[in-house]
Amino acid sequence: MPNLTANGISLAYEDHGDPSAPPILMIMGLGGQLSLWPDKLVADFVAGGYRVITFDNRDIGLSHQHTDERTPKIVPQIILRRFGIKLKTPYTLRDMADDTIGLIDALKLDHVHIVGISMGGMIGQHVCALVPDKVRSFTGIMTTTGNPKLPRPDSHVMKAMIKRGTPPTGREAIIDASVDMFAIIGTPGEDHHTNGMRERIARSYDRNHSPASTARQMAAIASAGDFRDFTRRITAPTLVLHGSADPLVPIEGGQDIASIVPGARMETIEGMGHDVSDRFMPELTAHMLEHFNAHS
């Protein structure tokens, strides 16, 4: 797997499809490695005539790790953010956006279609605002703007995320715990142990398991606060995809993006939670390919 230097750090990436085809750059969410993207989604984009680039954000997977940095504690991050107190973090969403822009430049891409999921959608909004001339289109999946007036995650999700106790040890137990978390935040009624999610999580674990990295990325999200000033600067054709049953990032987050970006199209995926479920893959893929085709 290749690495390149972007924004002064090493980023791991994968490049799929015809190098001369219009490129799609996919930005993963909190704690997610490039291996968490469903293989079928990538394959369908390639079959649709696109070049697809996935990568590990900084501090995750096989990209640069901030192992020498202090790891923030999750609960204080959440509390401080609610009171509007600025956090000290190893890096910010803006840094991660600059990484993404550096990747675009290092790959010598003139224009890209950006797809960002969850935290990746937050990073994507920053990229669209910072380098509008490089973005053909933007797709934000289950993401938000940091608007403090929006609904918070469901209480049962917050309890699960901040619960104390002895962390699981051993490969299988750690993978099981991660899958169980997706059962809490994901599509209701899905068996995440059999729908492909466990396989992708296991693949990520085997590449590089680093819980501290996830905590540092969460600190970057918390420190961003309200970033609607970036959202307002988006000029790229924008598609917003959001599940009606998302308990982690309520659908109002996607609606906020759609209400701010001129001409944005919002598609509600009925019954989908905070995951990319196989059940909804055809619908998601169709919406995105239609969007790419209209703006390539």
Which role does the model predict for each range below?
Residues I234, V240-H242:
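Short beta-strand/loop motif that positions the catalytic acidic residue
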Residues R82, P90, R94-V112:
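Conserved acidic catalytic loop of the alpha/beta-hydrolase fold
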Residues F138-P168:
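Flexible "cap/lid" loop of the alpha/beta hydrolase fold
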Residues I9-F83:
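Conserved HGGG/HGGXW glycine-rich cap/lid loop of the alpha/beta-hydrolase fold
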Residues E172-A215:
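Conserved alpha/beta-hydrolase catalytic His-Asp/Glu region
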Residues A264-S296:
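Catalytic active-site module of serine/aspartate enzymes centered on a nucleophile-bearing elbow/loop
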Residues A245-V249:
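Acidic catalytic loop of the alpha/beta-hydrolase fold
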Residues D110-K149:
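Conserved hydrolase catalytic core segment
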